[in-house]
């Protein structure tokens, strides 16, 4: 049976990658204080493409290495490799091609630092997290979350090359936001899917430490997140428009986290999971709008 374009598309986890590259795009915008030059626009577009291809490759490798686990979990049992729509060698060739194209674009037309950071993130997620951390510790998503948190820095690097300590610090603050956001986001899903993780012998926190403990950890990280998201304002990266949006978004997220301690039903964790995605997209949208469209409110 021939492999369809949709099968290859599904290997890239397009919804997940869309959120990843959106945060990279915001990083690009925030890195440029004024109107971008034509060179910055061209470099940014090529950087966006390279980061997107690398993230897609990482997703495909993750599915290749996690095929046996995916087959045991209802959430992932439909994936192309699991149901036999594609073969392992086809996934490997596809991912390899994406990596080669991505690295070529980044090295030749963007800059070496972006290529190095992007490749390191790819290895961090597709290999270190998938092969080792995911199966080794209940803190898998905390430690491994760093690889998934780097896209804003990758975007920042693409248009600037990170020439100053201020660039590194500001880009790192955006990384920190996603890093702290990842545990409550993923643990909300893990609570609902804990039986699947237990069946697949994946030591997610709800499996190893129980649901009540996980709910408390979600609240702790959500409080930390509310604090960390104030950092862009504290360093002068963002202004009152972003601050207002962040306050509202954090208030709702904190309500979800507090309500998770005594949820009304089993589905509530999935409602929080869904909101966490909206939260991150909206937060970074506020960062971008504040930076580009509303300088007069600063």
Curated annotation (Swiss-Prot):
Question: Any extra detail in the entry?
Answer: Carbon 2 of the heme B porphyrin ring is defined according to the Fischer nomenclature.
Instruction: Please provide the Gene Ontology terms (biological process) for this protein.
Output: heme O biosynthetic process
Q: What is its EC number?
A: 2.5.1.141
Membrane topology note: Multi-pass membrane protein
> One Pfam family name from the record?
UbiA
InterPro entries the UniProt entry points to: Protohaem_IX_farnesylTrfase (IPR006369), UbiA_prenyltransferase (IPR000537), UbiA_prenylTrfase_CS (IPR030470), UbiA_sf (IPR044878)
Is Cell cycle set as a keyword in this record?
A: no
Q: Which reaction does it catalyse?
A: heme b + (2E,6E)-farnesyl diphosphate + H2O = Fe(II)-heme o + diphosphate
Name of the protein this chain belongs to:
Protoheme IX farnesyltransferase
Question: Which family is this sequence assigned to?
Answer: Belongs to the UbiA prenyltransferase family. Protoheme IX farnesyltransferase subfamily.
Locations listed in the record: Cell inner membrane
The gene it comes from is cyoE
Q: Which keywords belong to this entry?
A: Cell inner membrane, Cell membrane, Heme biosynthesis, Membrane, Transferase, Transmembrane, Transmembrane helix
The protein's annotated pathway? Porphyrin-containing compound metabolism; heme O biosynthesis; heme O from protoheme: step 1/1
Query: Does the keyword section mention Mitochondrion?
Result: no
Top-level taxon in the UniProt lineage: Bacteria
Q: What class of enzyme is it?
A: transferase
What is the role of this chain?
Answer: Converts heme B (protoheme IX) to heme O by substitution of the vinyl group on carbon 2 of heme B porphyrin ring with a hydroxyethyl farnesyl side group.
Predominant place of localization: membrane
**NCBIfam families xrefs:** cyoE_ctaB, PRK04375.1-2
Gene Ontology MF, one: protoheme IX farnesyltransferase activity
GO CC terms for this protein?
plasma membrane
Any transmembrane segments, and where?
Answer: 16-36, 45-65, 93-113, 114-134, 141-161, 172-192, 223-243, 244-264, 277-297
């Amino acid at each position: 049976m021939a492999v369809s374009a949709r099968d290859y598309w599904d290997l890239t986890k397009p919804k997940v990658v869309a959120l990843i590259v959106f945060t990279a795009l915001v990083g690009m915008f925030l890195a440029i204080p004024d109107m971008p030059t034509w060179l910055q626009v061209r470099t940014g577009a090529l950087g966006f493409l390279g980061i997107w291809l690398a993230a897609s490759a990482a997703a495909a490798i993750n599915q290749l290495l996690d095929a046996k686990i995916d087959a045991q979990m209802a959430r992932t049992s439909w994936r192309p490799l699991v149901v036999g729509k594609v073969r392992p060698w086809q996934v490997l060739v596809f991912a390899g091609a994406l990596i080669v194209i991505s690295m070529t674009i980044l090295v030749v037309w963007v800059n070496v630092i972006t290529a190095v950071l992007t490749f390191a993130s790819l290895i961090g997620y597709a290999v270190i997290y998938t092969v080792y951390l995911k199966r080794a510790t209940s803190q898998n998503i905390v430690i491994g979350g760093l690889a998934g948190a780097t896209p804003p820095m990758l975007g920042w690097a693409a248009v600037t090359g990170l020439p100053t300590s201020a660039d590194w610090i500001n880009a790192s603050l955006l990384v920190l936001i996603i890093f702290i956001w990842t545990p409550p986001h993923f643990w909300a899903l893990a609570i609902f899917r804990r039986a699947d993780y237990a069946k697949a012998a994946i030591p997610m926190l709800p499996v190893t430490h129980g649901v009540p403990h996980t709910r408390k950890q979600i609240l702790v990280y959500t409080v930390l997140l509310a604090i960390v998201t104030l950092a862009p304002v504290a360093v002068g990266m963002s202004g009152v428009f972003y601050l207002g949006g962040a306050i509202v978004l954090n208030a709702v997220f904190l309500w979800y986290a507090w309500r998770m301690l005594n949820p009304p039903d089993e589905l509530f964790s999935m409602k929080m999971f869904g909101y966490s995605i909206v939260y991150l997209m909206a937060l970074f949208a506020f960062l971008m709008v504040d930076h580009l469209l509303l300088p007069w409110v600063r």
